[in-house]
């Protein structure tokens, strides 16, 4: 069964829609250049109602320093920390040990060689994530709506289930899963009515589409 992560949540109604729709993961962004950026205290308030829920909370970061990791663990207490920058295997190991949380390592993909880079992290992290490489000059490493050739993931096997991300929405997620074979999917801009503005109806539609895969 394919599982979904709804990323970039910032309002209670969006969180509620994600959980009610059956999302396995909910993500909160901590990156100042993103329209979805939150402070850890605000995220902690949003996830307070989820402690009795099986949904896993994810703190999405870009090259986080130790101070941010410590602040996240003191406030939001995420189940997983997603790193979406230039983190090395050594740094990823440090983040995992310092936080005690699982780590999702994201990769920007435009070719098979980009997928190959994940091998150095396989077995080191809880999940790998393959996202579209942003256009040149973009300040955001993800959440841009860009896609890559989903078939680059077809036949790839990793020690833990991996995520497909980048340009997914309620209308193409079934095709994306079929083309990639990915067991996990991640969506952000594809369920928004504007930059950073999640639409609960689109969240529900996306999760319904995933259930039909």
UniProtKB/Swiss-Prot annotation:
This is N-(5'-phosphoribosyl)anthranilate isomerase. Keywords: Amino-acid biosynthesis, Aromatic amino acid biosynthesis, Isomerase, Tryptophan biosynthesis. It comes from the Bacteria. It comes from Caulobacter sp. (strain K31). One of its GO terms (biological process) is L-tryptophan biosynthetic process. The keyword Amino-acid biosynthesis applies. PANTHER family: N-(5'-PHOSPHORIBOSYL)ANTHRANILATE ISOMERASE. Belongs to the TrpF family. It is an enzyme of class 5 (isomerase). Pathway: Amino-acid biosynthesis; L-tryptophan biosynthesis; L-tryptophan from chorismate: step 3/5. It catalyses: N-(5-phospho-beta-D-ribosyl)anthranilate = 1-(2-carboxyphenylamino)-1-deoxy-D-ribulose 5-phosphate. One of its GO terms (molecular function) is phosphoribosylanthranilate isomerase activity. The gene is trpF.
């Amino acid at each position: 069964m394919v599982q979904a992560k709804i990323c970039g949540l910032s309002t209670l109604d969006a969180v509620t829609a994600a959980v009610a729709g059956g999302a396995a993961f909910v993500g909160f962004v901590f990156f100042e250049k993103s329209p979805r950026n939150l402070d850890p205290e605000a995220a902690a308030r949003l996830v307070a109602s989820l402690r009795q829920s099986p949904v896993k909370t994810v703190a999405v970061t870009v090259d986080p320093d130790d101070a941010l990791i410590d602040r996240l663990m003191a406030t939001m207490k995420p189940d997983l920390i997603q790193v979406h920058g230039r983190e090395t295997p050594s740094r990823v190991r440090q983040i995992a040990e310092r936080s005690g949380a699982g780590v999702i390592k994201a990769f920007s993909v435009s070719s098979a060689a980009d997928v190959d880079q994940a091998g150095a992290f396989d077995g080191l992290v809880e999940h790998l994530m393959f996202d579209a490489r942003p256009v040149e000059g973009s300040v955001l490493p993800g959440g841009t709506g860009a896609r890559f050739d989903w078939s680059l993931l077809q036949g790839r096997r990793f020690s833990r289930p991996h995520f497909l991300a980048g340009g997914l929405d309620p209308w193409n997620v079934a095709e994306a899963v079929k083309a990639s074979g990915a067991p996990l999917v991640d969506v952000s801009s594809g369920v928004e009515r504007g930059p950073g503005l999640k639409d609960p109806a689109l969240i529900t539609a996306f999760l319904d589409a995933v259930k039909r895969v």
